[in-house]
């Protein structure tokens, strides 16, 4: 089967989605295990992105997109966390959230800030879907609401 031009956007989108999921996993692993950014990026690129590990084949991911998200979140965390905190309900602190939810919100907020070429709806939808991969109930709704508020604040638009 050959790649036709119409196949390319779908393939690129799927690889970006896989990169987003891997970035969330890497950010989670960094927070829980205290792993540094260089070590985690090297581990994911060598053993996870498009690789087989413990009988599971990881999706092929856009490695540069993955690196951009992980390194950008680490670099900009002091800017991202207050944005996320201001989008949470008054009685919730970022530290109260599950580590996976924090990783999802940080990655999504980073993309909303830095990836102006990607529509808000795409970013929010992708990270809500990632939340659904880990959680069944309230967390995907929380991710949707928080990223939607942040998008309105920094881009002046909501997910449509």
Swiss-Prot record:
Entry's Gene Ontology cellular component terms: cytosol
GO terms, biological process: DNA-templated transcription termination; transcription antitermination
Family matches, as Gene3D superfamilies: NusB-like
InterPro entries, per database record: NusB-like_sf, NusB_fam, NusB_RsmB_TIM44
Gene Ontology MF, one: RNA binding
UniProt KW keywords: RNA-binding, Transcription, Transcription antitermination, Transcription regulation
Superkingdom of the organism of origin: Bacteria
Statement: the UniProt record of this protein carries the keyword Transcription regulation: yes
Cross-referenced PANTHER family: ANTITERMINATION NUSB DOMAIN-CONTAINING PROTEIN, N UTILIZATION SUBSTANCE PROTEIN B-RELATED
Its job: Involved in transcription antitermination. Required for transcription of ribosomal RNA (rRNA) genes. Binds specifically to the boxA antiterminator sequence of the ribosomal RNA (rrn) operons.
Family under the similarity heading: Belongs to the NusB family.
Protein name: Transcription antitermination protein NusB
Organism: Sinorhizobium fredii (strain NBRC 101917 / NGR234)
Gene: nusB
């Amino acid at each position: 089967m050959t790649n036709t031009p119409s196949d390319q956007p779908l393939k690129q989108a799927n690889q970006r989605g896989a990169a987003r999921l891997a970035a969330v996993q890497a950010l989670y692993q960094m927070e829980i295990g205290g792993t540094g950014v260089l070590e985690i990026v090297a581990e994911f690129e060598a053993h996870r992105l498009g690789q087989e590990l413990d009988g599971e084949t990881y999706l092929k991911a856009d490695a540069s997109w993955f690196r951009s998200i992980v390194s950008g979140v680490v670099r900009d965390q002091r800017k991202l966390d207050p944005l996320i905190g201001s989008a949470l309900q008054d009685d919730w602190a970022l530290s109260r959230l599950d580590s996976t939810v924090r990783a999802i919100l940080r990655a999504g907020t980073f993309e909303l800030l830095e990836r102006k070429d990607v529509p808000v709806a795409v970013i929010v939808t992708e990270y809500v879907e990632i939340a659904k991969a880990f959680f069944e109930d309230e967390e995907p709704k929380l991710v949707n609401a928080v990223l939607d508020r942040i998008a309105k604040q920094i881009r002046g638009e909501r997910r449509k």
